[in-house]
Curated annotation (Swiss-Prot):
GO terms for cellular component: lysosomal membrane; lysosome; Ragulator complex. As part of the Ragulator complex it is involved in amino acid sensing and activation of mTORC1, a signaling complex promoting cell growth in response to growth factors, energy levels, and amino acids. Activated by amino acids through a mechanism involving the lysosomal V-ATPase, the Ragulator plays a dual role for the small GTPases Rag (RagA/RRAGA, RagB/RRAGB, RagC/RRAGC and/or RagD/RRAGD): it (1) acts as a guanine nucleotide exchange factor (GEF), activating the small GTPases Rag and (2) mediates recruitment of Rag GTPases to the lysosome membrane. This is Ragulator complex protein LAMTOR5. Keywords: Cytoplasm, Lysosome. The gene is lamtor5. It comes from Xenopus tropicalis. The keyword Cytoplasm applies. Pfam families: LAMTOR5. InterPro entries: LAMTOR5.
Amino acid sequence: MEAALEQHLEDTMKNPSIVGVLCTDSQGLSLGCCGSLSDKHAGVISILPQYAAKLTSDPTDVPVVCLESDNGIVMIQKHDHLTVAVHKVTS
């Protein structure tokens, strides 16, 4: 599984507008990262979708947390027990 995850991270980074990607487990431990997102971001990245899910009354909703700045956007979404963050620059 680790090799498959690393391959997915590398494939994601091939998009020229993506400058970082991070995958964490449900405990906030980094499972893999590339580019601008590093292991030190794993805890914060993993908790944000959990808080966002508390803002909806529909338990089947899967929120996407978007952190925007003048330089880009970080999109974060939880999938089962994994959380994925993608850092994309704006052109």
